[in-house]
UniProtKB/Swiss-Prot annotation:
PANTHER family (alphabetical): EH DOMAIN, GH06923P
Protein name: Increased rDNA silencing protein 4
PROSITE patterns given in the database record: EF_HAND_2, EH
Family: Belongs to the IRS4 family.
InterPro entries in alphabetical order: EF-hand-dom_pair, EF_hand_dom, EH_dom
Biased amino acid composition, Polar residues: 43-69, 84-93, 109-124, 187-204, 415-428
Gene: IRS4
UniProt signal peptide: none
Domain EH: 663-753
Species the sequence originates in: Debaryomyces hansenii (strain ATCC 36239 / CBS 767 / BCRC 21394 / JCM 1990 / NBRC 0083 / IGC 2968) (Yeast)
Task of the protein: Positive regulator of phosphatidylinositol 4,5-bisphosphate turnover and negatively regulates signaling through the cell integrity pathway. Involved in rDNA silencing.
Length: 765
């Protein structure tokens, strides 16, 4: 019964379905699409008719795109769809019609004629679905809460439908053209005009060529202007050099040879350099290429952007101008007063005075003989100008004043000192420190004592000397040391000795002196109690008589004679590494070793000499100014005389040269090559500046180092000056401060700078 009822219900549903389809086709227009609804299987069978119709329409509308693919694929796709249909209990049940002869089979793969028609209708009316949905929606409110007008909504919906239906490519092209025209209007340009920022299609190739030609012509005009300016500058430089050459040639010295090239040669060189595209030729200075390519040489890295032209370094100078001898003497006197203090000699300044308002000017080069002839200065005045170049060094008295004074020893109390007498073979010996009659007499005594050739000290102020004992312990007395107005004679002292020999006790021999720093100074006299002739009262009377005789103290005079020390042989072959490590120089802590701070070490000197050898004599021949001590005419007079004379005469000339150099000023001038110098043994200031700049020290410190080292005052340095300057740069990098003046020990540590002898140690190979 249940099966019969179900079949009857299904048949009724199919009949109602066909009737409703006909009614809907007649009543609804063609331009409307139906809204799909979901099928609810839980509803009673009477209400499932409408749901079934809506479900079939929705399924057909969603599978419009799949129908074309199904036609090509065939039945294989339909079989796959049947296999992949969900059959789970949780999924919604799809209603299937029973297989009856009256009703067709309803399944996912089989399509009824009605469903096909519905799919066609949905495909034709799918474009108007959005319009229908918008018309059915109620009017919405705008952003301010007011309802929008229905007329505007309808117009907007119609425009949306029209834009959705316009798929013609010609319409798309028109829209693009309209957008381009709107851009021209926004930029205030008509469509026929050309924008300067971008080339439009309307520009012709002739116009493009004309614009390119105009740009090229404008660039050539600017280049021609630059060339004219460079030619003008070159002409100005040539005029300056010609004026210098003419002034030098017009002087009365006909034998002078000029090492500078002529103006015509310079013009040729400059033209060849300007025309050549080779960068190596453009680095040449006055047409002379750089041949030094060593890594340690300065010439390998000479070209820089900041300073391409060769010129003397600009140095701040305070008191470097040529002054009169009287003014030089006053300056020298002021410097001595500044260095008269004891503490200032060996302390470095905490701050180096750098004034911004100092005048920055090139180095003033002293007048040469040619310049003196041009200015009309007589030859008698020229030596005065060279005398001003004399190095001002303190005298011996000032140097003694500069040395540190040792603190005098503390004065001993009078009561704490008591003499002790001992008796040996033929005399007596005193031990302990005795006082002088007065402190002033002690000081005069200390200065007047002089050392004898025979191993003793003598007094220069007194005439008579008295020797008390002939043994190893020497003691000399003069008249001022003896108390009282009467001067005792030698015979009287001999009588006193015989008196003392009878009364004083005999002491045992002293084997060795005690070398303790704090020995017992209050030692009581030792006497022999077995001797019946001696007594304490006799000893006291003897000591009172000899107290008046003042013995020179050991603090004022050194110990006489040479004390033999026992020879200690080395017991092991080990070295004391702790001691060597303690006293060795530590670069990380240079302030802990003060013994090597006042002279240049051998390793440092070799390192600086390597820089000197690779950079000496560079670009000196290219300089315009003359240098001090360089003979541009030929060889010096003394060397020419030595070459022309015989062997005995040359030896005499050399010996006379050594005797003349005893003067301190002459020695200093020879040390700094002020009298005679070779260009190959000088280094230019530009090279020194570039080398010192690599240390990255401040500019003020480098200028101060140059002022301390520069004695030539012509923009060059010789070998010792360059070595000391490099040493000062290293000391600044270590953390030391620059001194007011370079100590003489630093200059003396260089020794014979010209000699470089390597001694090989003889040993096993």
């Amino acid at each position: 019964m249940a099966s019969n009822n179900s079949t009857s219900q299904l048949a009724a549903l199919a009949a109602f379905k066909a009737i409703n389809n006909k009614k809907n086709e007649e009543s609804q227009p063609n331009n409307r699409s139906r809204i799909p609804l979901k099928v609810d299987t839980t509803a009673p069978p009477q209400t499932q008719m409408k749901a079934l119709n809506s479900a079939t329409r929705a399924k057909s509308s969603n599978k419009i795109s799949q129908t074309q693919a199904d036609k090509t694929r065939g039945q294989t796709s339909e079989r796959k769809d049947q296999k992949t249909t969900p059959t789970g209990s949780n999924m919604t049940n799809i209603f299937k019609m029973p297989n009856t002869p009256k009703t067709p089979k309803i399944s996912k793969s089989a399509e009824t004629p009605n469903s096909v028609g519905a799919s066609r209708r949905s495909s034709t009316y799918s474009n108007s679905f959005a319009v229908e949905s918008l018309e059915n929606e109620p009017p919405k409110n705008d952003n301010f809460g007011e309802p929008l007008s229905t007329v505007n909504n309808l117009e907007r919906r119609k425009t949306v439908s029209q834009h959705s239906l316009n798929y013609d490519p010609q319409d798309m092209i028109r829209n693009v053209k309209n957008s381009i025209g709107s851009k021209y209007i926004s930029n205030d340009l008509s469509p026929g005009q050309v924008n300067t920022k971008r080339l439009s299609t309307g520009t012709q190739p002739k116009d493009m060529l004309d614009s390119v030609r105009n740009s090229i012509n404008s660039k050539t005009k600017t280049n021609s202007k630059n060339q004219e300016m460079s030619q003008r500058n070159a002409l100005i430089l040539n005029g300056i050099r010609d004026s210098i050459d003419s002034k030098r040639i017009s002087s009365h010295h006909d034998n002078s040879t000029i090492s500078l090239p002529l103006a015509e040669e310079r013009d040729k060189i400059l033209k060849s350099i300007s025309k050549s595209n080779n960068p190596e030729e453009q680095l040449m200075l006055y047409g002379q290429p750089i041949y030094n390519y060593s890594s340690s040489s300065f010439a390998s890295s000479f070209s820089e952007n900041d300073n391409d032209q060769l010129r003397t370094p600009v140095i701040i100078r305070t008191d470097m101008d040529l002054l009169d001898p009287d003014s030089n003497a006053s300056i020298q006197h002021d410097e001595r007063e500044n260095y008269s203090n004891e503490d200032d000699d060996f302390e470095y300044n905490d701050t180096y005075d750098t004034k911004e308002d100092k005048e920055v000017s090139p180095i003033n080069i002293p007048l040469s003989s040619h310049a003196c002839a041009r200015l009309g200065i007589s030859n008698n005045d020229t030596p005065k100008t060279f005398m001003n170049l004399r190095i001002q060094t303190p005298d011996k008295e000032d140097s003694s004043r500069l040395k540190p004074k040792r603190k005098p020893p503390p004065e001993m109390d009078n009561d704490s000192i008591s003499p002790t007498f001992t008796e040996q073979s033929d005399g007596y010996q005193t031990e302990g420190d005795d006082r002088m009659s007065d402190a002033s007499s002690n000081r005069t005594r200390r200065h007047s004592v002089q050392y004898n050739d025979y191993g003793g000290y003598s007094d220069a102020s007194s005439k008579s000397q008295i020797k008390v004992n002939d043994d190893s312990d020497y003691s000399y007395f003069d008249e001022s040391d003896l108390s009282g107005s009467e001067t005792p004679s030698v015979e009287k002292i001999d009588n006193d000795k015989s008196f003392l020999d009878d009364r004083l006790p005999i002491f045992p021999d002293i084997k060795a002196k005690s070398r303790k720093l704090f020995r017992n100074r209050k030692s009581k006299p030792i006497y022999n109690s077995d001797d019946p002739d001696t007594s304490k009262s006799d000893l006291q009377s003897a000591t009172e008589e000899l107290k008046n005789i003042s013995v020179p103290s050991r603090t004022s005079t050194p110990v006489m004679g040479h004390q033999s020390q026992p020879v200690q042989l080395k017991a092991t072959m080990r070295t004391n590494k702790k001691r060597e490590k303690k006293y060795s120089f530590n670069e990380n802590k240079p302030w802990k070793n003060h013994s090597e701070l006042s002279y240049i070490a051998e390793s440092e000197r070799k390192r600086y000499e390597g820089l000197w050898v690779s950079n000496k004599g560079l670009y000196i021949n290219c300089a315009v100014s003359r240098f001090i001590g360089v003979d541009y005419n030929g060889k010096p007079e003394i060397e020419s005389q030595i070459e022309n004379q015989d062997a005995p005469t040359t030896a005499a000339l050399l010996s006379s040269r050594t005797t003349n150099e005893d003067n301190s000023n002459v020695v200093q001038q020879n040390f700094h090559n002020l009298l005679s110098a070779e260009t190959s043994q000088l280094i230019h200031g530009v090279v020194v500046k570039r080398i010192w700049k690599r240390s990255r020290l401040p500019k003020e410190t480098l200028e101060a180092i140059w002022d301390l080292v520069d004695f030539r005052k012509d923009g060059t340095l010789n070998k010792p000056e360059f070595l000391v300057g490099m040493w000062l740069v290293d000391q600044c990098l270590y953390g030391r401060k620059l001194p007011k003046k370079v100590d003489g020990t630093v200059w003396n540590s260089l020794g014979n700078v010209g000699l470089n002898v390597v001694l090989k140690k003889k040993g096993r190979r």
